[in-house]
């Protein structure tokens, strides 16, 4: 197992896979792709057709401010809608005692785009020129617009949270962290 080494080339030599990385070459009989947000690219290096592509979606969180933690004493999740690929915002109690609310789901402009300002032009180009993303947007136009609105407006994000906790107010939440979801999308 080799971690923290970006694979730049893969090839099969006999019954072994050779992975070339900045840390050197590594050989093994089996290849397990654990490249997360880059797994489609690593699969391409291994000779697989890129029929499915990873499109990065940033999930932004808010957290309850200190004086509002009593509003949520347990995990609170919405009933999933099987027609949509994302669960929707929810409340999660954290092990250290805090409570986070979220996430939304918006296109990240970089595969490691944890902030709204993170932009990687090749990653962004890869996403916006992919027909699978546009098929997704056409299938879920309302949800796409609402998720973007929630990203741009704390008030709109709070309104989504009020479906689960009606008494929550904009002043009860403050910006939290973010994650990036590796959303696998088919071309068609």
Mark where each language-model region is.
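Generic structural signal for well-ordered, non-membrane alpha-helical segments
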Residues: 35, 84, 126, 150-158
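A conserved beta-strand/loop element that lines the FAD pocket in flavoprotein oxidoreductases
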Residues: 1-7
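Flavin-dependent oxidoreductases
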Residues: 10-120
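Short, well-ordered beta-to-alpha junction loops that form the rim of enzyme active sites
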Residues: 5, 104, 176-178
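Short, solvent-exposed secondary-structure boundary motifs
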Residues: 1, 78-84, 182-188
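Extended, charge-rich helix/loop segments that form flexible
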Residues: 110-144
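Flavin (FAD/FMN) cofactor-binding core of flavoprotein oxidoreductases
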Residues: 53-59, 63, 67, 135-188
């Amino acid at each position: 197992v080799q971690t923290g080494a970006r694979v730049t080339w893969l090839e099969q030599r006999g019954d072994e896979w050779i992975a070339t990385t900045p840390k050197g070459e590594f050989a093994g009989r089996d290849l397990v792709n654990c490249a997360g947000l880059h797994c489609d690219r690593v699969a391409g290096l291994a000779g697989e057709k890129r029929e499915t592509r990873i499109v990065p979606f940033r999930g932004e969180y808010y957290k309850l401010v200190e004086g509002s933690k009593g509003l949520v004493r347990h995990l609170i999740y919405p009933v999933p809608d099987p027609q949509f690929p994302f669960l929707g915002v929810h409340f999660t109690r954290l092990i250290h005692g805090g409570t986070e609310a979220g996430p939304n789901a918006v296109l990240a402009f970089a595969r490691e785009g944890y902030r709204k300002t993170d932009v990687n032009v090749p990653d962004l180009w890869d996403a916006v020129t992919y027909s699978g993303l546009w098929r997704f947007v056409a299938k879920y136009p309302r949800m796409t617009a609402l998720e973007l609105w929630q990203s741009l407006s704390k008030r709109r994000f709070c309104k989504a949270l009020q479906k689960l906790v009606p008494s929550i107010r904009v002043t009860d939440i403050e910006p939290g962290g973010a994650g990036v979801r590796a959303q696998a999308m088919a071309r068609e």
